[in-house]
Amino acid sequence: MTSTQAIFEKVQKVKKTINTATTAEKNLALEEMAKQLLISRADILAANELDMTAAKGKISDVMLDRLYLDEERIAAMAEGIRQLIDLEDPVGQVLERTKLDNGLVISKKRVAMGVIGIIYESRPNVTSDAAALALKSGNAVVLRSGKDAYQTALAIVTALKKGLAQTKISPDCIQLVSDTSRASAQAMMKAKGYLDLLIPRGGAGLIQAVVENATVPVIETGTGIVHVYVDKDADQDKALAIIENAKTSRPSVCNAMEVLLVHEEIAAAFLPRLQKILVTDRDAAREKTVELRLDEKAAQYISGSKARPEDFDTEFLDYVLAVKLVSSLEEAVEHIEAHSTHHSDAIVTENDAAAAYFTEQVDSAAVYVNASTRFTDGGQFGLGCEMGISTQKLHARGPMGLKELSSYKYVIQGTGQVRK
């Protein structure tokens, strides 16, 4: 087992091969990485089967689905890498240029961060997405997978390194930490001087531990306590379609809705229809039904579990939905601001004034009007695959693409000027 410190030192020795690579060199590397991912799919699937077998009975079915790979998902991972080839390289872009009265020309230029560390849980696609995004933005990357997905991550990294071996960029620019204990995570949090940025991707516990303990700069990819508010002026058919998609299309992801707020004026008509699409119809179709956790007012109209206060502060990542009735748009916004993780929140309404109020008052990274929150995704936003969804405000917010993984420096050109 290679020590975490040895990995830090190794990546420091080779980072210049990617930090200074040309766009053409990086794009060639991405193409070779995508090819090797497909060539190695049998090895990746075999490794994934080991992880799946070990995880069964220890994690939920929804989390098992996150871990699971098949040929279609591997093909999607390879396609995600290839999509980055067509995106503009941020490194080297001149953001601003100013000529001062003394003749100095000051340019603000995008540069790579250097070395990015990623701590993540049981998401195999994060391994390929993170490596590809880091490389296209000129960065080396140190990956630390969760224990549940380690064998899969190792097989993926092995394939990606084979791709890099066909190029001028050192394969050692992608590193996978073999130690999945807390000690390696702590080492990455304290790797000042070795990591220029640390990004945690996972549950609330992981993210909180990194934010509270890291001495390395961190971008917080927050959990998703995602709300949909159905206004009294909503198109109810539209609202039901949005809710069904936001809750059931993939409940294990951070942009899935967890809390539904409904204006009490439409509760009598709307809630029975909600129960029909999320419970009755799904049961008849032998699909997983949604457990509705209802506040006291909602329980007067439909059946379900009694909501506890903590249900409105929980990222379920499962077929569970907390439901609350509100008396006004203002109450809905107040609830969201009190309980949201500022990831993604939506309003369904045909009232333009209500929509404008909601988008101005809700302080989240992505605020939707009449659309599913499932669109909060780098690919859906046209950014290619993403490094995560930032819920903080400094440096990056929302889906993090290539530009968010770069910094900038000032280049000052003179003709012999001295300061007087």
UniProtKB/Swiss-Prot annotation:
Q: Which GO terms describe its molecular function?
A: glutamate-5-semialdehyde dehydrogenase activity; NADP binding
Report which residue ranges the record marks as coiled coil: none
Q: Which Pfam families match?
A: Aldedh
CDD domains for this protein: ALDH_F18-19_ProA-GPR
Gene Ontology CC annotations of this record: cytoplasm
Q: Which UniProt keywords apply?
A: Amino-acid biosynthesis, Cytoplasm, NADP, Oxidoreductase, Proline biosynthesis
Its function, per the record, reads: Catalyzes the NADPH-dependent reduction of L-glutamate 5-phosphate into L-glutamate 5-semialdehyde and phosphate. The product spontaneously undergoes cyclization to form 1-pyrroline-5-carboxylate.
Q: Which domain of life is it from?
A: Bacteria
Annotated pathway, please?
Amino-acid biosynthesis; L-proline biosynthesis; L-glutamate 5-semialdehyde from L-glutamate: step 2/2
Biological process terms from the Gene Ontology for this record are: L-proline biosynthetic process
Q: Which InterPro entries match?
A: Ald_DH/histidinol_DH, Ald_DH_C, Ald_DH_N, Aldehyde_DH_dom, G-glutamylP_reductase_CS, Glu-5-SA_DH, GPR_dom
Family according to the record: Belongs to the gamma-glutamyl phosphate reductase family.
Q: Which PANTHER family match?
A: DELTA-1-PYRROLINE-5-CARBOXYLATE SYNTHASE (PTHR11063:SF8), GLUTAMATE SEMIALDEHYDE DEHYDROGENASE (PTHR11063)
Q: Where does the UniProt entry say this protein principally localizes? A: cytoplasm
| Statement: the UniProt record of this protein carries the keyword Glycoprotein | no
Location(s), subcellular: Cytoplasm
Entry keyword Glycoprotein: no
Under catalytic activity, the entry for this protein gives: L-glutamate 5-semialdehyde + phosphate + NADP(+) = L-glutamyl 5-phosphate + NADPH + H(+)
Q: What is this protein called?
A: Gamma-glutamyl phosphate reductase
What EC number(s) does its UniProt record assign? 1.2.1.41
- Species name for this entry? Streptococcus gordonii (strain Challis / ATCC 35105 / BCRC 15272 / CH1 / DL1 / V288)
For this protein, the record's NCBIfam families field holds: PRK00197.1 (NF001221), proA (TIGR00407)
